[in-house]
């Protein structure tokens, strides 16, 4: 991914770069984003800094907040240290439940603590408001559901 970020910076385009971070350290990011085992957080941040240096465009970091996984006070402090001094927006998205996945949405108290730590450290952060989660149409919930069906032959389709 860092080589692609460097290529994007060289294009002199008007693209806004959004990086899916989801964890403030390699140990946790290796679990959540398997490609991190090949490209660590440090290398990713170096590429992001290069993009900013070349383009002058503010970076966006995406962080899906998962209850009991990446929403601790320690995670917030580590994230603050990682982003401190960068011209960037941190877009935090509290997890929206998806059937079949083990993750949970953090409590309102956990979200508030996480936000307070980041804001106290001077991090520019936006917490996405949950919309559509009651009808499974929120961020992360829109995905194809498979159904058992018998494929139609061309003749059967023509007869229908």
Where are these regions (language model features)?
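A structural preference for short, hydrophobic beta-strand core positions in alpha/beta folds
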Residues: 92, 126-129
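Residues at the C-termini of beta-strands that transition into short coil/loop
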Residues: 20-21, 129-131
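Radical SAM enzyme core and accessory elements
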Residues: 132-160
